[in-house]
A protein has these predicted regions:
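N-terminal helix-loop segment corresponding to the beta1-alpha1 unit
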Residues: 1-100
Length: 100
C-alpha cells in the first residue's frame, strides 16, 4: 500500500524534548519529511516515561519513529557549530526550550 508524502524533500532539525515536540516531528516524518533529532548524550528525558525497554520508553520509540538522530553537547563550541550547520541546511527548525 502506498501513501502520499506531501513533505518529501523537507528537511527538519528537531531539538524538542518531551511529548508535544517529538510527536510533531514524528508526524512530519510520517508525511515524508527528513527529520533529524538532536539530543544530548544522555538522551531526551522522555526515554524514561512509562515502561522502558533498554534505553527507550514506548513513547520514546513511537515519538522518534522515522527520524534520524545525532547526540551533541550544545555547551561546547563544536556541538553548537554542528547544530548551526544542520539548521542552516534545514527548511524547518523545531525546539521546545523555555524562554531565556
Amino acid at each position: 500500500m502506498s501513501y502520499e508524502q506531501p513533505y518529501k524533500g523537507i528537511k527538519v532539525v528537531d531539538l524538542s524534548q518531551g511529548i508535544a515536540g517529538p510527536y510533531c516531528g514524528m508526524l512530519l516524518a510520517q508525511y515524508g519529511a527528513d527529520v533529524i533529532k538532536v539530543e544530548p548524550f544522555e538522551g531526551d528525558w522522555s526515554r524514561i516515561l512509562g515502561v522502558t525497554y533498554g534505553d527507550h520508553s514506548a513513547f520514546s520509540v513511537a515519538g522518534n519513529l522515522g527520524k534520524r538522530s545525532v547526540a551533541l553537547d550544545l555547551k561546547t563550541d563544536e556541538g553548537r557549530e554542528i547544530v548551526n550547520r544542520l539548521i542552516d541546511e534545514a527548511d524547518v527548525f523545531m525546539e521546545g526550550f523555555r524562554p531565556g
